[in-house]
C-alpha cells in the first residue's frame, strides 16, 4: 500500500472548499513560483479572500549595471509568509539597478507587502534552499521539506504541497498541542502530520479505510 495513496485519502477527509476574491500580484521584477504549497504556473491568478496565513515563493530578477556592461541577476527562491486580506495584495521588491543594490539584496532581502488601500502587511521570510544538482529544479518538494521543519517562514499545513489537491485550513476540528512527525520521507511525515490534525472520528474512519487496502 503506497503512503501517497493513503495521504491523499487523508487530505480528502479533512479538506474543505474556499471561495476566492482578492488577488495577489507582484512588482515587475517578482516571479511567483509557489502559492500555499502549490506550484504556480505562468499567468496564474493568485487569489485569497481571508485573513488566514498564506505563503508564496518568489524569485527576483533584474538587469543591472556592472561597470560599463549590463548583467542579469536572478535570486534564489525566497519564501514569504503573511496573513491574507479580502483586498487585493501587492508584493513589491526593490529596484536592483547596480552591483551595490544586488549585494545589499543578497545580504538582506526586503519587500513591501500591502493591500490596495495601502495597509502594510507584516511578513516572515527565508531563503528556500535545495540540495544536490540543480537544487532549484524541484521547488515544490523543497518547499514541502521546508514546511515540515521549523524554519522561520514555515507553515506546516502547506506541507502537503506534493499532493495534487488544494488544502483548506480546518480550524473547527483539529488536535491542539505540539505535533511531532517522524519518517524516512516527506510523504510519511505529511501523513503523520495530517492524521494528528484530524479529529477522532476522522482518524477512526481513516484507519478503517486503511485496513481495507
Swiss-Prot record:
Keyword Amino-acid biosynthesis: no
Signal peptide: 1-21
InterPro entries: UPF0319 (IPR018635)
Disulfide bonds: none
Domain of life: Bacteria
Pfam hit, one: DUF2057
UniProt keywords, alphabetically: Signal
Entry keyword annotation includes Lyase: no
Family: Belongs to the UPF0319 family.
NCBIfam families recorded: PRK01904.1
Protein name per Swiss-Prot or TrEMBL: UPF0319 protein HAPS_0727
Organism: Glaesserella parasuis serovar 5 (strain SH0165)
Amino acid at each position: 500500500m503506497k503512503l501517497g495513496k493513503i495521504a491523499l485519502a487523508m487530505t480528502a477527509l479533512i479538506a474543505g472548499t474556499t471561495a476566492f476574491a482578492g488577488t495577489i500580484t507582484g512588482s515587475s521584477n517578482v516571479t511567483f513560483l509557489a502559492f500555499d504549497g502549490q506550484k504556480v504556473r505562468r499567468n496564474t491568478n493568485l487569489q485569497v479572500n481571508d485573513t488566514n496565513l498564506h505563503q508564496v515563493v518568489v524569485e527576483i530578477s533584474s538587469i543591472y549595471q556592472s561597470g560599463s556592461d549590463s548583467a542579469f541577476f536572478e535570486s534564489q527562491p525566497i519564501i514569504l509568509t503573511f496573513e491574507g486580506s479580502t483586498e487585493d495584495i501587492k508584493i513589491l521588491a526593490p529596484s536592483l539597478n547596480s552591483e551595490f543594490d544586488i549585494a545589499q539584496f543578497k545580504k538582506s532581502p526586503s519587500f513591501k507587502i500591502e493591500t490596495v488601500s495601502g495597509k502594510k502587511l507584516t511578513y516572515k521570510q527565508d531563503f528556500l534552499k535545495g540540495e544536490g544538482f540543480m537544487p532549484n529544479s524541484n521547488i515544490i518538494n523543497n518547499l514541502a521539506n521546508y514546511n515540515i521543519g521549523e524554519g522561520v517562514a514555515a507553515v506546516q499545513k502547506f506541507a502537503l504541497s506534493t499532493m495534487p489537491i488544494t488544502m483548506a485550513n480546518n480550524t473547527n476540528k483539529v488536535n491542539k498541542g505540539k505535533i511531532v512527525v517522524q519518517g524516512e520521507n516527506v510523504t510519511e511525515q505529511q501523513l503523520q502530520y495530517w492524521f494528528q490534525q484530524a479529529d477522532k472520528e476522522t482518524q477512526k474512519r481513516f484507519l478503517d479505510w486503511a485496513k481495507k487496502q
